[in-house]
Amino acid sequence: MPTIMNCKHLGICGGCSSPQSAYADSLKAKEQILHELFAPIFPPSEILPVIPCDPVLRGRNKMEFSFFQTKEGKKSLGFITPTKPKQGVPITECLMIHEDTMDILNLTRAWWDNHPELTAYYPPFNKGSLCTLTVRIGSPERKLMVILTTSAREEYAVEKGIIEEWKNALINSSLPIVSIIWEEKVSAKNAPTYFRSHLIHGEPFIKQTLTLPKDGNSGVFHVRPRSFFQPQSLQGAKIIEIAKEFMNPQGSETLLDLYCGAGTIGIMLSAYVKKVIGVEIVPDAIDSAKENILINKKENLIEVYLEDAKTFCRRHQDCPPPDVVVIDPPRCGIQNKVLKYLLRIFPKKIIYISCNPKIQFEECCSLISAGYHIKKVQPLDQFPHSPHLENIILLEREDSL
């Protein structure tokens, strides 16, 4: 195995917290933390070994960079330190991202240097022009989507001609860019923040292909700027494989996919069940889900609803329960109001996928108190060299054991 050199930004940028050269050690540390966390409700010896990230380096399919500016006017485009006072880190290398992403970062820096009148956005005061630069990478072709987010406030609005300069710099490069999107962030006091999206080059999506490792079941997905998609494509397929094995489908099940995002889990698992119902609150994501259902010819197997999980569960609390509920919520977890109505639905099996095991543990305690039993726990790494760990748990109703 080749020697891996540590990144020069290690411990500074707020990304990696452990040396890139010591991946095995960081994996053991994550596993130990998970064992200690779940020991009160599940025997650590029965937790399955952590599935390592593959690839360990340059596997991230999405990365967001922040524009930053000091009071003295010093600019940076990269990451922002997690400690106070906040500082911008103008990264010149990153072992987590593809080299093409770094090229886009450098092209955008050069464009910003040519426009000193553009200031970095400062969220606390809603001031400044340039917010973030996001790069998404498709798989397996590694085509690129680039998203520039700027302020929509009139006094900080970026002229279309200046945006055109940025777009042309990207197009004139040799990079495989298939989508360029300009977003305007609309933010005001006592009003929800939203984004006006402008497609300025190519398609409004990138393609992601997922293939389950064991049986080769494959799906193609159109992912839009604000659609959720697992940050490591190969690991995302493994998560779905684990969910399938935990579900042990017989072909007659109804599956409820809460927080369905772009529909990836439901679409991939629809090959093994009778019916899938997907629920998602983000309009961009549900549009992607509907599109992906058609692309994969699953319209007779899957229904999706633009609705928050709590409202959906409340509306269906008196209906026959689904056989399996798959939950892949944001970092904040299911939350009490959703949990309350989920327990009224009372499905036989719950497969809980989480990127925040601490919240997952707390909510599993509530599920256990309500009559569920943890059957299996499978951790998986998606964020090498960081403290974050994905965890997949199978819970079954005690009366169905």
Curated annotation (Swiss-Prot):
Pfam families: tRNA_U5-meth_tr. GO terms for molecular function: 4 iron, 4 sulfur cluster binding; metal ion binding; rRNA (uridine-C5-)-methyltransferase activity. S-adenosyl-L-methionine binds at Q230, Y259, E280, D328. The keyword 4Fe-4S applies. InterPro entries: MeTrfase_TrmA_AS, MeTrfase_TrmA_CS, SAM-dependent_MTases_sf, U5_MeTrfase_fam. Keywords: 4Fe-4S, Iron, Iron-sulfur, Metal-binding, Methyltransferase, S-adenosyl-L-methionine, Transferase. Transmembrane segments: none annotated. The active site is at C355. Its EC number is 2.1.1.-. Belongs to the class I-like SAM-binding methyltransferase superfamily. RNA M5U methyltransferase family. This is Uncharacterized RNA methyltransferase CCA_00883. It comes from Chlamydia caviae (strain ATCC VR-813 / DSM 19441 / 03DC25 / GPIC).
